[in-house]
Amino acid sequence: MVLSDLDIKEPDSPESGLNGSDDMVREHETESKGNLYSQYEEKVRPCIDLIDSLRALGVEQDLALPAIAVIGDQSSGKSSVLEALSGVALPRGSGIVTRCPLVLRLKKLEKEGEWKGKVSFLDREIEISDASQVEKEISEAQIAIAGEGMGISHELISLEVSSPHVPDLTLIDLPGITRVAVGNQPHDIEYQIKSLIRKYILRQETINLVVVPANVDIATTEALRMAQDVDPQGDRTIGILTKPDLVDKGTEDKVVDVVRNLVFHLKKGYMIVKCRGQQEIQHRLSLDKALQRERIFFEDHTHFRDLLEEGRATIPCLAERLTNELIMHICKTLPLLENQIKETHQRITEELQKYGKDIPEEESEKMFSLIEKIDTFNKEIISTIEGEEHVGQYDSRLFTKVRAEFCKWSAVVEKNFEKGHEAIRKEIKQFENRYRGRELPGFVNYKTFEIIIKKQVIVLEEPAVDMLHTVTDIIRNTFTEVSGKHFSEFFNLHRTAKSKIEDIRLEQENEAEKSIRLHFQMEQLVYCQDQVYRRALQQVREKEAEEEKKKKSNHYYQSEDSEPSTAEIFQHLMAYHQEVSTRISSHIPLIIQFFVLRTYGEQLKKSMLQLLQDKDQYDWLLKERTDTRDKRKFLKERLERLSRARQRLAKFPG
């Protein structure tokens, strides 16, 4: 939809008669005007009202809303353009005039509506009933925020103007770009200003309005270059040429080429306006009169009159264009905004769940609250020790980590017993030489067999205890993480849970270590069921016979020179190794699972439930971290804003 000049300003000057003065024309104008306002109310106003309502809800604290940012080099005419659009005078002077971002919210009223304004900053609101007060209030607001000097601030100043003579727009006036610090300005003033500007123009929800004097080389304009950096295709950038009356004679055609988008291309193109000059301001020329003079200037200008006819010139045409651009931009960004609100709502909901519910005031309610928290914690502990807990995509369950340690233990046992035949035979020969008694050659010395077995088993005791400590640490850390997950916001409860986790760990680890060492003491009693041992021995002998057969088939085979007793001891050792390795590699993990996994978890569960017996401790246990209550309140407020915003968007007819 396209808005006309009538939506912006109703001139009462003689020039208004240029459109016809007879009664038929006036009647037609009145009818057209009524139809236009009807269309405006039906199509344009709902879009503006939607964004205004979201802004009133405070959604801007969470997400960027569609707006227009006005940028330009220092003294490019930014403030003059904003004055002409808003109908109010803004601070002027040399150096940096705009020292804080100024959010100018213009709201068009019906013809009978009265002008009103409001300045908001630093949690202050100042109602204004006279447009002449605006300049003074904005200046005082800037001093209150940025101080008396020439520094700038990121703190926003909001100016709301409601009037029948303004377009529906949201404009953000940003400080003019300066390159050299003067006077008491900070030495890095250029960097500060550019950082502030970039913060706004980076947002995809922002239309960048770049103000450039018509009498300068547009290619050298810093503001246009910054806009191009963040919007290379010019999809959301509009160029505004000012001061056309200062253009050197003979260069007018170049200005026309720029406005017609033939020099520095922008998809949204350019407009050209003529605002009040310094002399006109000193002579107190009203903004209404300035608009009339602007139109006459373009109508009478040989080169620029065509731009007026094309709708590319004057403040009213600019206001119409900006309103339409903002409406189109709102419609374009609404789906994205809706998705952002939905995603943010979901994220805040999940974050709020981490902080739980508010702590109740009633004692009975406190007990139920504590029961709920401890019960949830205990359920996850039990799920964890049973290997059924929920984990992230890149995390592993506790039992998976523990099983990995058990697999390492099995490999250690295998490696210990799978020594090479020569090494074992050498060891047997050494024992024969040292411990052989009065036996004749060929008799097996059972003592030699026992000593070798005991020696090979006992060396596994300390590795078994080391594995116990490793597994216990893994389990203790996991239980502590579960405590942090459920109790992190209640430091006394979390500290109590960690204390119990540590105490029970120490107790269960000691019990497990005693059992492990007891098991290795029992393994010093060389024993195996007869039928089991006979079966193992038979398997070893069959295997050796098969290997001997393969060796004899080899042409280069040479018989090993060994005593029959040595060979027999070797076979017995291998048979017993087979059984004892199976026993140790399985039984030690069973001991660890029983004491430092299952019993550990069950004891922790019982110990946490015992906390419910002392009602005097409820307040202490449920005491929250200092910032938790404030954080929960903050998240609830955000969630409420976003919920209401989703409702508004759902009802929007667009």
UniProtKB/Swiss-Prot annotation:
Binding site residues for GTP: 72-79, 173-177, 242-245
One Pfam family linked to the record: GED
Region (Bundle signaling element (BSE)): 336-361
Reported function: Interferon-induced dynamin-like GTPase with antiviral activity.
G5 motif: annotated segments: 274-277
Protein modification: ISGylated.
Region named G1 motif: 72-79
Organism the protein comes from: Ovis aries
Keyword Heme: no
Annotated segments matching region Critical for lipid-binding: 549-552
Designated name of the protein: Interferon-induced GTP-binding protein Mx1
Subunit structure: Homooligomer. Oligomerizes into multimeric filamentous or ring-like structures by virtue of its stalk domain. Oligomerization is critical for GTPase activity, protein stability, and recognition of viral target structures. Interacts with TRPC1, TRPC3, TRPC4, TRPC5, TRPC6 and TRPC7. Interacts with HSPA5. Interacts with DDX39A and DDX39B. Interacts with TUBB/TUBB5.
